[in-house]
């Protein structure tokens, strides 16, 4: 099974759970910020990560997002930033 680029993002209220999510995703990520992480994973790894971290969240207060990055899909953006397609599925967001 081949690995693909994926994005994991979260909004977690509890500091302990948030720190654990950050520590876990830093082991997998290629790049990212505090709550948004680009990771190179296969489908099994993605499912395990999503379920592992999702089990710790409080659905009443927290949010957890996973998506595959698909180069052939349109990119939607909203707000002050801008996006520019560079080449071969690369995207510049500023």
Swiss-Prot record:
Q: Which UniProt keywords apply?
A: Antiviral defense, Endonuclease, Hydrolase, Magnesium, Metal-binding, Nuclease, Plasmid
Write out the GO MF terms: metal ion binding; RNA endonuclease activity
**UniProt key word Metal-binding:** yes
Cofactor(s) of this protein: Mg(2+)
Which leading EC class covers this enzyme? hydrolase
What CDD domains does the database record attribute to this sequence?
A: Cas2_I_II_III
Q: Name one GO biological process term.
A: maintenance of CRISPR repeat elements
Sites binding Mg(2+) sit at 11
Q: Name one Pfam family in it.
A: CRISPR_Cas2
Could you say which EC number(s) this protein's record lists? 3.1.-.-
Quaternary structure and interacting proteins, as annotated: Homodimer, forms a heterotetramer with a Cas1 homodimer.
Similarity comment text for this entry:
Belongs to the CRISPR-associated endoribonuclease Cas2 protein family.
Name this polypeptide is given: CRISPR-associated endoribonuclease Cas2
- Which source organism? Allochromatium vinosum (strain ATCC 17899 / DSM 180 / NBRC 103801 / NCIMB 10441 / D) (Chromatium vinosum)
Underlying gene: cas2
């Amino acid at each position: 099974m081949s690995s693909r680029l994926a994005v994991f993002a979260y909004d977690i209220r509890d500091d302990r759970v948030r720190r654990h999510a950050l520590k876990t995703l830093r082991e997998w990520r290629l790049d990212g910020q505090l709550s948004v992480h680009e990771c190179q994973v296969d489908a099994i790894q993605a499912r395990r990560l999503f379920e592992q971290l999702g089990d710790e969240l409080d659905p009443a207060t927290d949010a957890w997002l996973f998506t595959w990055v698909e180069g052939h899909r349109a990119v939607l953006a909203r707000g002050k930033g801008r996006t520019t397609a560079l080449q071969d599925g690369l995207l510049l967001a500023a």
